[in-house]
Structure formats: structure tokens, C-alpha cells
């Protein structure tokens, strides 16, 4: 995608901003729901659950600039960002399915390894989507006013995602019932 100074349609800006709803949903899953899921549903002790989630967040801090660097240097017929986002979406989806699809037959350490592996997979998939996605605004237009409007749509949809996940988090059942 090459930046141009043409005006983007409202639909293009809104469509671009809508993607951030999915991005923010996973951020909240990563920072809120996984810890609750580990402790309230899987009965993982709080200290171990905290160590696991912190380790994955540190992993995320390391992988973000690496993916940004690699995506900046990708040359493909689909552009620099699209291959990363497409592959990342598949990896993220598989990671989320595995993260919340923990076999009940696992004991504590098996559960920790399972969740840690799939949480790490989901996190790298998320990074492969979110980092290139964030860079696309500058490639869609050179006009700072257009990019500002795009960011407005992005933040509006992010807010909707935050509200939706916040409500869902309050209604999630635990192993002991609602």
C-alpha cells in the first residue's frame, strides 16, 4: 500500500478503525480475562497465574519491535503489512481456541504448560496483527487531517470493544457457578 494524499471515504476510515475493536478485545483478554480464567476457572494459584501472565507480557514486549522491524522490511505482492496480518490472524485464532480449550484431564502443571503455550501463541499472533495494522494509517494517506480522522474512528471502535468486553467479563461464570 502506498501513501497518497487523496481523501479517504468515510467508509474506508470507519472500516480501518473497526479493526481496532478486535485489537482492543484481545488486549483486554490478555490483561484481564486470562488471569481470572486461570484462577477462578482452572484453580491455578494466584502467584503462579501472575507469574505466567507476566512472563507472556514480557515475551510480548520483546516480540513487538521484532515484528515491527520485520514487517517494515517485508516485500511481497500483497504489500508489507497484509501477509503479517493474515498469518497472525490464523495464529491468534488457534492460540485463543487452545487457550480457552484446556482439557479437563490435565493436572496443575499440565494446565500451566498448556495455557502458557497457547497464550504465547495467541500473543505472537496478536503482535503479528496489531503491529503492522498500526502502521497502515501512514501508508493509506499522507494527509495528517485524514490520519487524525482515521484515529478518531479507531478510538471510537476501541471504546465499543472495551465496553463489550468489560460487560462480558462481569457475566463470565466460574467453575462454582455464576
Regions found by a protein language model. Give the residues of each.
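Membrane-embedded alpha-helical bundles of multi-pass transporters/translocases
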Residues: 2-170, 175
